[in-house]
Amino acid sequence: MVRLVPRAFAATVALLAAGFSPATASADPVLVFPGMEIRQDNHVCTLGYVDPALKIAFTAGHCRGGGAVTSRDYKVIGHLRAFRDNTPSGSTVATHELIADYEAIVLADDVTASNILPSGRALESRPGVVLHPGQAVCHFGVSTGETCGTVESVNNGWFTMSHGVLSEKGDSGGPVYLAPDGGPAQIVGIFNSVWGGFPAAVSWRSTSEQVHADLGVTPLA
């Protein structure tokens, strides 16, 4: 499933802004960063990647809601622009099945966009990175924090992880990344679900191709 959402939200934001009090208008801008908790309707998820130049953020498509995207304390950070979500509804999935699961969020003008993880490490996008079984990766979710392990298997647009990578409710949409000693982390996936007992993420390489097809941009930092 692929959906693009009209840009009518700009008028909504303008109308809401007109009703702000001076105290609200002068408040510090919300900092938007990978690994932060976000809310959409009754969904609580983790933000996966933020492109400060494009002012677009990404999370899992199954995290989407019908209205604004907010922070944990319900401050509006942006609105849904596009998503893909064909996440299977059962408890198992065949390795040949393609899983697409991303949401693009156009950030509000008054937020500060950052690509810095809660650990203080920058998270960069290099869509051409190819994963291999056994490769060391880390995942950040608002429920479990940062956990690290290895790639278990690489499948059709998604991969599974083991040996220490954990997940709980609320971690969906969080970044999966390479974390070399020193230097920035490199995003390689967006957390999707648990399949066959293994935490799983959609490939950032595949997701970037889908974003380019849907929106005409490639997330880079």
From Swiss-Prot:
The organism's place on the tree of life at top rank: Bacteria
Keyword hit for Signal: yes
Q: Which UniProt keywords apply?
A: Signal
Q: Which InterPro entries match?
A: Peptidase_S1_PA, Peptidase_S1_PA_chymotrypsin
Check the UniProt entry and state the signal peptide residues, or none. Answer: 1-27
User: Which protein family is it in?
Assistant: To M.tuberculosis Rv1815.
Recorded protein name is Uncharacterized protein Mb1845
